[in-house]
Amino acid sequence: MVEGWRNGFRDATNSKPLFVTIYATVIIGVLVSSFYVFSAIYSPTNGSSSFLSFPPLSTSGRIHSLPQENATLELPVAPPPPPQALPPPVLEEAQGNSLGKIWVSPPRDKKMPPLETFKLTKELFGERVKDNVIIVTFGNYAFMDFILTWVKHLTDLDLSNILVGAMDTKLLEALYWKGVPVFDMGSHMSTVDVGWGSPTFHKMGREKVILIDSVLPFGYELLMCDTDMVWLKNPMPYLARFPDADVLTSSDQVVPTVIDDSLDIWQQVGAAYNIGIFHWRPTESAKKLAKEWKEILLADDKVWDQNGFNEIVRRQLGPSVEGDSGLFYAYDGNLKVGILPASIFCSGHTYFVQAMYQQLRLEPYAVHTTFQYAGTEGKRHRLREGMVFYDPPEYYDSPGGFIAFKPSIPKSLLLDGKHTIESHFILVNHQMKQIRSALAIASLLNRTLVMPPIWCRLDRLWFGHPGTLQGSMTRQPFICPLDHVFEVNIMLKELPEEEFGPGIGIREYSFLDNPLLPKQVKESWLDVQLCQEGKEGCEASNNTSPSRVLKFPKRSNEDTFKAIFSSFDDVKVIKFSSIEDAFIGFSDKEREERFRRRVKRYVGIWCCEENKTPGHIYYDMYWDEKPGWKPVPPQTPEEDHPPL
């Protein structure tokens, strides 16, 4: 098209001046119109779906290098800034050129079609298939934000051959009006979060198996996904490398078996095959497996879907399929299976704890929030820490603004000596005390606290271990997910104010580096430097330097904080250069007691010491008030409770 305009303009310049004027006018008009149209489409204030205005999030991981020389470590509030976010994709690219458009809402004057319209049929699936592949997830209304995140990542990757199974009509209607392809699972489930391991959770697993068994006879390849995972890279070319595979499955493997993007070596994979990400081809062997798997689950409602899958697939393992594909025979000796490499089809451990893909210099395709704690809230927070979760715009511009601080950790706590339970708790407790002060200040100023990155020496698991999983690529020390130390679900829960005081909002440590943070937040900033009262220039005042820096006395009380910082209510982000010794306590003792009751519940456990029953150790938010406190497991059943 550009070449055509160029040739036309060249011809015009060789003819009459009138034509030159006409061509110039037309070209200018096209450029102005294009600018107007694209501005309207991608303006953040556009009334269309807010997801269309989001730029693709950074998928770069983060491993923090540790300075070895300084006696005291000044750690960043968040990791180094991610690569500059790409601009939003061209509308047709984001929505798919050949399939029905995504994120285009039906006209509001249109009535909701009858439920039968969304019935699972070959024709409905056929409308979304591309290259004979369909990508599917399913869930209920409680997981709608996960589902929208899942869909948005795929459309950012220019994938539109997707369908979402709705397990309740509330989700079905909500997705329909957002322009997301949806079908009715016919489950009529509750719209609330059912909880991992609950009977309803197991029912959801059975729905997955029934769905696979129903879809494979349609003749389409099925990439089946849980809603608590996101796609970071188009997996279609990778899956196409293994055309002979009947099933390609992810796994819970935490020890690398390969260092490139080959399939994991099946003989070395001892962990469970994880059915949160797996690809099925409509072969006779795959159909036979799906049918038997369904029958086993329907016959015994106590069998977990993933356990059932592992049991029948592992009836026979091997031999390898001829060639060097990495496939192997399993199940009945005819099923050809491949195990997706855990380094790039990541679990919550290989991605968030080990950052295995980054250490091996590989590009991750997906991350699944396994190996985590604190339930659904913990999963959401993990994805937020990784800057791969899509929240609505108001999440990034909270009323009251934000408070952040730069943690300070002595080098000796982080790097010196052996990595033991004692050295781990000394390190974490040092950070916990600073977080406790920051929570108090956030509560005083009615601001949302941006949590700092937390450094750990030891991994957290469900069983006794020597500190890290042997053979894994976990570095020590490492920035551990917030749910390793804090009960994220409790921090986000609405607790009765009369007993626990006002709620305290939190954000993930990477929040201020997120490309979705709006300009009005990034540019509204106050740096606070603590100083020793009595020294020159250090007095309780709201006077700032020309570079927008406020000097503030250490060991200030509640009244001083309120008096000074009330002058900065319009500032979005207040960042303290240090939080140590900033606050000496609440003036209102009843409020302080309610605050203590609240934050005592915020911390969790470390697990677990080897050869001890029980082997878990409770974190204690007020460890420093107990002389001689030691990190030891409960010695009696009466001691086995959080230190409330």
From Swiss-Prot:
Q: Which residues lie on this side of the membrane: Lumenal?
A: 39-644
Family to which the UniProt record says this protein belongs: Belongs to the glycosyltransferase 77 family.
Question: Where is it chiefly localized?
Answer: Golgi
Q: What is the lineage of its organism?
A: Eukaryota, Viridiplantae, Streptophyta, Embryophyta, Tracheophyta
Q: Which domain of life is it from?
A: Eukaryota
Where in the sequence does glycosylation occur per the annotation? Answer: N46, N70, N446, N542
Has the keyword Transcription regulation been applied to this entry?
no
Short sequence motif DXD motif: positions:
226-228
Known EC number(s)?
Answer: 2.4.2.-
Its source organism is: Arabidopsis thaliana (Mouse-ear cress)
**GO CC, alphabetical:** endosome; Golgi apparatus; Golgi membrane; Golgi trans cisterna; trans-Golgi network
UniProt domain comment: The conserved DXD motif is involved in enzyme activity.
The residues exposed to the Cytoplasmic compartment are 1-17
Keyword Glycoprotein belongs to the record: yes
Spans through the membrane: 18-38
Q: Where in the cell is it found?
A: Golgi apparatus membrane
Q: Could you identify this protein by its name?
A: Arabinosyltransferase XEG113
